[in-house]
Amino acid sequence: MANKREFPLERTRNIGIMAHIDAGKTTTTERILYYTGKIHKIGETHEGASQMDWMAQEQERGITITSAATTAAWKNHRINIIDTPGHVDFTIEVERSLRVLDGAVAVLDAQAGVEPQTETVWRQASDYDVPRIVFANKMDKLGADFDFSVQSIHDRLQANALPIQMPIGAEDDFQGIIDLVEMKADLYDVDELGTEWETVDVPDEYKEEAEKRRNEMIEQLADIDENIMEKYLGGEDISVAEIKAAIRKGTLALELFPVLAGSAFKNKGVQMMLDAVVDYLPSPLDVKPYSATDPETGDQVELIAGDDKSFAALAFKVATDPFVGRLTFIRVYQGTLESGSYVLNATKGKRERVGRLLQMHSNQRQEIPEVFSGDIAAAIGLKNTTTGDSLTDPAHPLQLESMVFPDPVIEVAVEPKSKADQDKMDIALQKLAEEDPSFRAETNPETGETVIAGMGELHLDIIVDRMKREFNVEATIGAPQVSYREAFTKKTSAQGKFVRQSGGKGQYGDVWVEFEPNEEGKGFEFEDAIVGGVVPREYIPSVEEGLREAMNNGVLAGYPLVDVKAKLYDGSYHDVDSSEAAFKVAASLALRAAAKTAAPVILEPIMKVEIRVPEEYMGDIMGQVTARRGRVDGMEAIAGAEEIHAFVPLSEMFGYATTLRSASQGRGTFTMTFDHYEAVPKSIQEEIIKKNGGHAE
């Protein structure tokens, strides 16, 4: 191996910064890059010039959309940072970054505590077993309250928050931070950019409170660490090293979550947070090994971090860069890879050549000769690789577990302003869909209309905006449409018989299929229960294919039919006239016939909506929820406001942002995420069928 790795694996940290929108996540990342020497000038998000928000729309909207990957060094450790979006439409970006991280920093707004989107990203991080530390940011803000933030972690996330610091002052009087582990205080010079601070003994007026809090911290650690428990009960001294070891052990085991205080905007506490990343978050060696499948034998294999193993990596993001073209971001789980070498895309079974390898710093890039185990880098030259694909050594193919992406819930028709733009628009949409698996673009073969689908209105706005900026395609978009589905609600059996025997080669296919509703989300399940060859083996795949194709067009209003179990149990064939095509048609006829007795319904996406408004607007807002066919699931008082939890059909939520803004004089906010599908009321079902020129039988 020609190149030597700069940082050993145990001194590598792959972390994400996750938060609710506006908690100060991008500013926090920005400061990390500033203090680790990657940025010379600090850019403020609210001035629209942040280092990490590298797409033009992100700078305009002041929100982070694309997870940019950045590398920094701190105290002889390499820290790879993935900046994740806080807006609910982009939870797919959060999911995909969590998949490749080892640890995360959850940023809270110290005045608001845990907010709805914090809960969403926290739940996603828990699904992937990602250890976290929490940074209570904006301690300088009016109403900032560190203890309230800690309590909100216990109450709203049911997580064992461990405060390892205590702020000195708050709001305008936020002067510094006491480290409860080392019992030292960091006091900041008000005028400096936070690069100037002094570490002193805990000031006398804070000693008693700090001692009390340190004791509480040790008591909490004793609950999960026997060594601390014994020493604590025996009244023995517990060293700083022992406390740090216990915090690290508890954090890695997801038994506790250290909480720190600071103000990224005022440059306070970021360095101590970086120390905590190094001290408490895992290296690639600390996380449980990822599993992969050997495609030849089907055996499960554990991926062990180490440069001496065969190369295995996951492509977790594809982005188009204006200067170098298509970038594929990869996380290396084991082995090394040199630029110019070949890899096998085990997902697609294709060999690809890696032209160059880049380490990304926000939107700057540095070419590197080789990537090592545990690294995150971007590869140029991979033409067939898309998000979620496994890249491995051609001599040792391995299939990593792919990522699961949600289906889009909202769609709009999009049309180029001029006919000349049609081809350009098709290319742009294809590239954008490659980058973002939660976005789809399809052309209706009958009407020629192009429809784009995504996770929310903002998601699609940004896609249209990117078409204009990056691909110079001007497009107009129609009104948003809901992605409805159809389902059977009763068990039934039906025959599908397709016979054509007049002149020339005939056609003959005959099937009996039993249909029943499947559990929500289980999809289509096909069972072959043919006995005695009444339908020959070679035609059975055609029956399944015929059913799948017919389900795509539904039975009521042309929406996909979902969650159906189909059992092929009888039928007949003709020695000469039967063919795969005939059985395919017969299967679709069986589905149509079944629709008459299976009581089909139209399903609509139901969103989980959380609305936060000052108390005086509660009545009006509750009325709005009910008027939108919503059902209120609960309410709670949070930080001087009321939060309403409700389930509302997506079709009723279009344009709600404007309604809420005017009803609450701009003081209300809401988030919504897709929750489940449920049947629409009968009257609405009839309207939908009528509107679609429905073909209910």
Swiss-Prot record:
Residues 10-285 form the tr-type G domain. It is found in: Cytoplasm. It comes from the Bacteria. InterPro entries: EFG_II, EFG_III, EFG_III/V, EFG_IV, EFG_V, EFG_V-like, EFTu-like_2, G_TR_CS. Signal peptide: none annotated. The keyword Iron does not apply. Keywords: Cytoplasm, Elongation factor, GTP-binding, Nucleotide-binding, Protein biosynthesis. One of its GO terms (cellular component) is cytoplasm. One of its GO terms (biological process) is ribosome disassembly. GTP binds at residues 19-26, 83-87, 137-140. GO terms for molecular function: GTP binding; GTPase activity; translation elongation factor activity. Belongs to the TRAFAC class translation factor GTPase superfamily. Classic translation factor GTPase family. EF-G/EF-2 subfamily. Catalyzes the GTP-dependent ribosomal translocation step during translation elongation. During this step, the ribosome changes from the pre-translocational (PRE) to the post-translocational (POST) state as the newly formed A-site-bound peptidyl-tRNA and P-site-bound deacylated tRNA move to the P and E sites, respectively. Catalyzes the coordinated movement of the two tRNA molecules, the mRNA and conformational changes in the ribosome. This is Elongation factor G. The gene is fusA.
